[in-house]
Amino acid sequence: MGSMQLKVAQQLSEPGGQVNEDLIWHGGNDFMVLDGASSLTPGSHHDAVGFVRAFTESYAVCARADKPLHTCVNESLDTLRERFDPARYEQGIGPSASLAVVRCHNGWMELLLLGDCTALILSTDGRTERTYLNEVARFDAIALDMAARIHEETGLPIRETIHNPLVHEQLVANRHMMNQPAGYRILSATTKPLTSTDVMSISLDGLAGIILHSDGFDNMEDDLTRQPIDLGRSYRMLRELERTDADLNRYPRFKIGDDATALYLEVVPA
């Protein structure tokens, strides 16, 4: 068998509200999904949108095939530190983003995940391997559990209890754990540089493709990987599930509908 490579087969990125803070980017042999989170500064006006765009622009300049993937990511972040000065943000916490990035070279792919983006690796024999960092989910669960307890105590729907001041305080505390030793790794220009990243090196031999997705598609993996793959079908199913749980009580979460982004890459001959 000759050398294999990755090709964009389908891509979808839809907002959960008025503004989409997710982004898909691909250039050459590099492909990525970003899930932005705006700062908590009053009047920030979705500053994650500018952050994820700035990162991809920087990455397009910094990334080279002869550099390790984690070096390309760190150097891209370093160029943004002056633009996203911590002094501009409440408690020094600027916008951030989860990341799933794949680089393909000579029949292999490198995969790097930060935050709560997910990779679904599809084998030609029908198996799926889900690759996901549980770091952000650990902290989100603390805030969601708090909102659920207030719901049980007061009878208010979780749609309202997630705005409780105690829950907000917990969310702020979570943000302070970005890129801390006991916290979670994520793209941020206002925290310490990333000291460690886990890069997987995976042969494309025996693979059918890979799906990168933001957490807006969490718990939708069974449909995302159902053949024939149809990201539009999965998206419609997601929004219908959300519509039937407008109070957030059945599936506790921070908003009725999150931004939902997925990138499906097929393995094809080079």
Regions found by a protein language model. Name each.
Residues 1-270:
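PP2C/PPM-type serine/threonine phosphatase catalytic domain
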